[in-house]
């Protein structure tokens, strides 16, 4: 009985250490915080397209890019969502 418990603990611990030591499959380079901070802030101003206060601006934006309509949705209606039909 003791041997079975000891063998189980040993196998589980070896599997755990092998999983931790295994190399990562996705080694994509990370973006440094300085590069993100240096990016122009002009995109932040355009992100909402009038949402949540001016839904007409969102609608006009969506029509300008070839969509049928636009409305404010998502969390706290902060995202301009464009529809095709």
Curated annotation (Swiss-Prot):
Residues 1-21 form the signal peptide. Disulfide bonds are essential for antimicrobial activity. Residues 22-47 form a propeptide. Its main location: secreted. Disulfide bonds join 51-72, 58-80, 62-82. It comes from the Eukaryota. This is Fungal defensin triintsin. Belongs to the invertebrate defensin family. Keywords: Antibiotic, Antimicrobial, Cleavage on pair of basic residues, Cytolysis, Defensin, Disulfide bond, Fungicide, Immunity, Innate immunity, Secreted, Signal. It is found in: Secreted. It comes from Trichophyton interdigitale (strain MR816). GO terms for biological process: defense response to bacterium; defense response to fungus; immune system process; killing of cells of another organism. Antimicrobial peptide with broad-spectrum activity against Gram-positive bacteria, Gram-negative bacteria, and fungi. Also inhibits clinical isolates, including methicillin-resistant S.aureus (MRSA) (MIC=32 uM), K.pneumoniae, C.albicans and C.parapsilosis. Displays minimal inhibitory concentration (MIC) values similar to minimal bactericidal concentrations (MBC), suggesting a disruptive mechanism mode of action associated with membrane lysis. In vitro, shows hemolytic activity against human red blood cells. GO terms for cellular component: extracellular region. SUPFAM superfamilies: Scorpion toxin-like (SSF57095).
């Amino acid at each position: 009985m003791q041997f079975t418990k000891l063998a189980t603990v040993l196998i589980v611990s070896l599997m755990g250490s092998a999983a931790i030591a295994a190399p990562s499959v996705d080694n994509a380079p990370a973006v440094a915080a300085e590069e993100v901070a240096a990016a122009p802030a002009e995109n932040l101003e355009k992100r909402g397209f009038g949402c949540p206060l001016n839904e007409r601006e969102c609608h006009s934006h969506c029509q300008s890019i070839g969509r049928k309509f636009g409305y404010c949705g998502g969390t706290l209606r902060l995202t301009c969502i464009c529809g095709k039909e």
